[in-house]
UniProtKB/Swiss-Prot annotation:
UniProt KW Translocase keyword: no
GO cellular component: 90S preribosome; nucleolus
Annotated family: Belongs to the RRP36 family.
Source organism per UniProt: Neosartorya fischeri (strain ATCC 1020 / DSM 3700 / CBS 544.65 / FGSC A1164 / JCM 1740 / NRRL 181 / WB 181)
Stretches of the chain forming a coiled coil according to its record: 238-279
Tree of life domain: Eukaryota
Protein known as: rRNA biogenesis protein rrp36
Lineage of the species this protein comes from: Eukaryota, Fungi, Dikarya, Ascomycota, Pezizomycotina
Subcellular location, record wording: Nucleus, Nucleolus
Length: 356
């Protein structure tokens, strides 16, 4: 209990009273052992005086051996008593005191280095008790604490507990006098309608995007008109070819957009008509247009929107297109590409002849 009290108080390792008690006990034990040895020596001397010379020498040797055994027994008893006292005192130490002592000692590497330094300086490893080690470690911890408190805190840089923790900054750091009164405008970013949330927000409907970007059709028409005017004014053949190519691609694009718009109008009218029939009870199931029927209705709507002259020209172009398609599907014998006597075969080298 003495050692635990001292560790908890953090003043001393062992009080002076216990040391005096231990010293008195050891002294009394040594005196009693000396008296026993003296008594045994007197007995041996009496017995040896009565015998002859040979017996005297044997008795003397026996006495010396007995004295050595007694001394060894005394040393063993003293060491056992000391170890028992230390173990009893250590068993009464509280866990809190042990934890404080261990925290104040520092890492094991420092302990080992200090132990090696002590052994190298002395040249011999003295058999120190665990209490002496605890006392030395407590002294070292106090010295380290005293040295750490003496250092100035300004030299220590603020460090974070981990890399994810926020940065620590002193409150004495002066604040800058510069203030942002007016924030500069943000840099303009290009907007792509394919990925614009304003366009894609309405559940992916293309009608919203078309209505929002309907002005692009006007731009395309104006661009096509401008290219046609340039083509009429230019005389460079290369520039003319480039303008013709651009005009052709622009007209194809406008034609495709117009055809898609007609298809959507035809589908919307058909769905509306079918819904009205179902509502009136004339139909139970709606009729869905096939691609061929949709194509016919779109073509009919296209011709209805044209004028008389445009309609005639469009029909003539369509007729030429159909005849060319039929001629391609016709076999080679019926196309008039060779004489009847020399029929056309894959291995022959006859030339093709155009029909007038």
């Amino acid at each position: 209990m003495a050692v635990s009290d001292l560790l908890n108080r953090r003043v001393r390792a062992v009080p002076d009273e216990d040391e005096e008690v231990y010293s008195e006990a050891s002294a009394s034990e040594s005196e009693s052992n000396d008296e026993e040895v003296e008594g045994s020596g007197s007995d041996i001397s009496v017995d040896s005086s009565e015998g002859d010379y040979g017996s005297e020498s044997q008795d003397e040797s026996d006495a010396m051996s007995n004295e050595n055994e007694v001394e060894d027994d005394e040393d063993d008893e003293n060491s056992d008593d000391g170890q028992d006292d230390v173990q009893a005192s250590l068993s009464n130490i509280s866990f809190g005191a042990l934890a404080k002592a261990q925290a104040s000692l520092g890492p094991k590497a420092k302990r080992k280095s200090k132990a090696t330094e002590s052994t190298t300086d002395d040249g011999e490893t003295p058999a120190a008790s665990p209490l002496d080690d605890i006392r030395a470690r407590i002294r070292e911890a106090r010295e380290q604490k005293r040295q750490g408190s003496s250092k100035s805190k300004d030299l220590e840089k603020p460090s974070r507990s981990s890399k994810h923790a926020p940065m620590v900054q002193s409150s004495k750091h002066p604040v800058t006098r510069k203030r942002t009164i007016i924030e500069p405008p943000a840099a303009l970013k290009s907007r792509d309608p394919r990925f614009d949330p304003a366009v894609r927000s309405q559940s992916g409907r293309s009608e919203a995007s078309q209505s929002a970007y309907a002005f692009l059709d006007d731009y395309r028409a104006a661009e096509l008109k401008e290219m046609k005017e340039k083509l009429a004014k230019t005389k460079d053949p290369r520039q003319k070819e480039a303008l013709k190519r651009d005009i052709r691609s622009a007209t194809d694009r406008l034609r495709t957009i117009e055809n898609r718009r007609r298809e959507k109008e035809v589908l919307a009218e058909h769905k509306k008509r079918e819904k009205e029939l179902i509502r009136d009870g004339k139909k139970s199931n709606p009729y869905f247009l096939k691609k061929s029927d949709l194509k016919k209705q779109v073509l009919l709507k296209k011709y209805e929107s044209m004028g008389s002259r445009q309609r005639v020209k469009a029909l003539e172009r369509r007729q030429k297109k159909l005849t060319a398609k039929e001629r391609k599907e016709m076999p080679m014998e019926r196309r008039g590409l060779g004489n009847d006597s020399t029929p056309y075969n894959d291995g022959g080298g006859g030339k093709r002849r155009r029909l007038a």
